[in-house]
């Protein structure tokens, strides 16, 4: 990694070099790093387990550089996205790279699914410290896991009046995930308004789709109905 950082600095890519030096997970050089740069990247990838995104569009690394990257990816399971300019790279080498990236993506998906499963289980079991320790490892792209009742971790956190944990999850999840309704068409907002949780309700309202805000559960109630019933002004 040290050689790669020095190479990036010498080629004028100081911002990218500083990012890697500080543990950055993405590399998007805006200039052509060529075959030499690709080889230094390959050497770094053999030891680096933090880089997840690499964009080399515009860099003409050729067959030699691509082969070096493919060889490095054989033992690297952390890089999930790699974009290349395919000029002068054989189909065989490109396919080899694609296979390794797909392998890494599949492994990462399984890992994220396991984290989400553990998170839901921890909240259901009231193991709050355990749940808090898992959240930093959750990737927002994969935060939409649900259990057999179509509940997300957020459903359980809100239903158990866990304000701090709920806000942490809201900040981590996408709008689409926050808006998920369970098997009874209850969103997290239904639970928040039914439990009189005004702070969480406001956080949710500002991070949900309109369709979710208007969702009617199997009892015929919207989240607003519960808010009115509990005399909470939203």
From Swiss-Prot:
InterPro entries: Ankyrin_rpt (IPR002110), Ankyrin_rpt-contain_sf (IPR036770), LRR-containing_regulator (IPR052201), LRR_dom_sf (IPR032675). Keywords: ANK repeat, Repeat. ANK repeats lie at residues 149-180, 184-213. Gene3D superfamilies: Ankyrin repeat-containing domain (1.25.40.20), Ribonuclease Inhibitor (3.80.10.10). Pfam families: Ank_2. This is Putative ankyrin repeat protein RF_0063. It comes from Rickettsia felis (strain ATCC VR-1525 / URRWXCal2) (Rickettsia azadi). The lineage of its organism: Bacteria, Pseudomonadati, Pseudomonadota, Alphaproteobacteria, Rickettsiales.
């Amino acid at each position: 990694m040290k050689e790669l950082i020095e190479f990036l600095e010498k080629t004028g890519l100081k911002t990218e070099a500083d990012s890697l030096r500080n543990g950055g997970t993405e590399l998007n050089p805006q200039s052509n790093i060529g075959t030499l740069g690709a080889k230094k990247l390959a050497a770094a990838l053999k030891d680096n387990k933090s880089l997840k995104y690499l964009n080399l569009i515009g860099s003409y690394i050729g067959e030699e550089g691509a082969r070096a990257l493919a060889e490095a990816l054989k033992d690297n399971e952390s890089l999930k996205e790699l974009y290349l300019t395919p000029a002068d790279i054989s189909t065989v080498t490109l396919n080899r790279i694609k296979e390794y990236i797909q392998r890494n993506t599949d492994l990462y998906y399984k890992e994220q699914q396991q984290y989400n499963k553990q998170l839901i289980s921890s909240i259901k079991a009231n193991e709050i410290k355990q749940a808090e320790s898992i959240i930093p490892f959750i990737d927002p792209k994969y935060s939409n896991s649900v259990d057999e009742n179509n509940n997300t971790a957020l459903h359980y956190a809100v239903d158990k009046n866990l304000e701090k944990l709920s806000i942490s999850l809201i900040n981590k999840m996408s709008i689409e995930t926050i808006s998920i309704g369970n098997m009874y068409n209850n969103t997290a907002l239904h639970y928040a308004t039914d439990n009189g949780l005004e702070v969480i309700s406001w956080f949710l309202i500002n991070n949900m789709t309109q369709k979710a805000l208007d969702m009617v559960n199997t009892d015929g109630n919207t989240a607003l109905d519960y808010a009115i019933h509990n005399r909470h002004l939203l």
